């Protein structure tokens, strides 16, 4: 087999169920020496062909990746790795497996695939190797002896039982599973009695279907024989275990299998007997016992369940796991994490319950189950699978004619919209995301269902493109309603999404309040996923406030926790925050952290990858490497397009890059866009960059106005990260007009604030800063310079801000010309140049159209112009005054 795998890229182990295909595959894989290792993909519990690729992705350690197909993620991850992938139990998913193999072998030249299946996959280039039964004279006998000694310590094969053991192995065709069943009976039967028991079993099957393949007859003989040895009560329990997939616990068995003919209190005893007779496997899972049926045995049990006419057992199985899922939405205090972990353990049963409901037309129940699992879809990064569940019903015309509760459909549409928003399947705010949310809201209001309404309102807020103003009324109503119906999980989600909007506001105080409120609730219900995000927001608020040490410590702590919990999305955001803080601290470690952020984001794809490149842009800018920063920014931009807020905030970085590269016109446009679309810290930084652009273009009045506006923005919201940059700009501008002492005092105040907050100037601005310092020192002399510097450094931050703003109103603008225009008038000119009407300009500036016309009248008078056309032409000639 090793030789086959060395010469062929696809080898399939074929054979009957129970012949040992999986065991052989594991042994072969364990002996593999491919340098990049192996992965094992267990397809036995998978019932949906659509998640075969996702199952393979999870086997190699890839979580859901927003913004990229699972197949593309697999191709990228495996790439040129020399590795072995084992696809186990392919027979019920042949088409999906074939598609997966074609894609991976075509894209990954060093990948080898070893498959196990009851029949060949049926592909060109496939090498099929049929797994034989064990040698009856030695291997099968050794297996029987080994398994018998486990149930009856001291058992050995001797002269008195060797012939009987040989007979058992021969008549069971050397099939390992059948031999293991037989050996398990040594607890209560001798080998001779076991051999005699096989006589009746084979006679029972002698009249079976002639066309049936031998392997099915042989395996069925073994299982039929084991089944015949059960009591009637044991047989009832055995067949009622058939709906379970991937394992189950005692509580589940009692809920699903017990009934009038099976006392709940006797279930444990009967289950123990089935374990003893090797029809059920008992596993110790972290101190708790879980049970499972081997797949071939489960299929046999399914046939018996079908023959019994007990179809309600499937419904009881579905109802039990639906109730488990529903408990996720009503967690008791600090119970959320435990419930999520339990649901994750039972994910295969939840999948089976959903599949059975959908296949049997129980659409209401299927949608309820999918909606109840929102905490799993979000908290355990199963977002793509969750969306596929909703799409498999909501987008399938076959199910549209089936009656579904309006409230259930409304909630399903809302939950789908939230998943689509998170995955960024379309640009946030796009119609195909907003429309389902709005439809859900209309339906929920129509039926007056509070639970559906609160989900629909939340979805509308989430899908509104991170527009805090647009989302506010939805979130406000949803918050009141969630509190009224005591829906803590949904309330936590509402507070979370409101926090996202607050991040975009750039207000550290508002963000701190939102983060603490949401984190407190998340901690109360035990939702660590949301709690970690809130803590990252707190680190962001600390950064904006200039508390860089605290911001770095908190972001490191949360990143480590996220990594330990395999919470990749939070890990990416944590690394991004670290890289940003380290960049502002001037630490060389920012580059390595940004690299780690990109690597982690690659697992997720989509907007997260854009965030990773944005982190590298910060690190490179801080280090003065404009080329590397441009490369990272160019990689980030197209990815971030699906998230308007991210694009807008990235404009600030692009403005800095353009200016550092000598393109002042592009820098101004980027800065203008950022100033128009941002608030808080983001706007303060954008104004500072625009002031730098104006300085570079020889427009001191414009530079002074923007620098003062940046300073005022920071002072109003207590934002100190970035404030020294504005102070240093004002210092240089003061020196240019002869206010040397004022300029040096501002330099001293800026230096003191940098020392206090650990802020370091980005290296790309060092040359301009040093030029200002040199000019002021030469103008004043060393002694006066040092004295003024010390005076500025002695000022408190508030005193320094007041000092910088003190002379702002004293400077007079000229009566005519471009320099006479106020900041608002310059904004109006710029927007007119962009082709906007007065009405559109009014919307952008949050004023009335009449006010816009008044500004234009003043502009015409100051510039000596008579029309809009003349204004546009003159602005174009000057390169716009803004």
UniProtKB/Swiss-Prot annotation:
Xref: InterPro entries: P-loop_NTPase, Sig_transdc_resp-reg_C-effctor, TPR-like_helical_dom_sf, Tscrpt_reg_LuxR_C, WH-like_DNA-bd_sf
Protein name per its UniProtKB record: Putative HTH-type transcriptional regulator Mb0914c
GO biological process: regulation of DNA-templated transcription
SUPFAM superfamilies listed in its UniProt record: C-terminal effector domain of the bipartite response regulators, P-loop containing nucleoside triphosphate hydrolases
Superkingdom of source: Bacteria
GO molecular function terms noted in the UniProt entry: DNA binding
Domain HTH luxR-type: 814-879
Residues of the DNA-binding region: 838-857
Keyword annotations from UniProtKB, A to Z: DNA-binding, Transcription, Transcription regulation
Coiled-coil stretches noted in the UniProt entry, renumbered to this chain: none
SMART domains listed in its UniProt record: HTH_LUXR
PROSITE patterns: HTH_LUXR_1 (PS00622), HTH_LUXR_2 (PS50043)
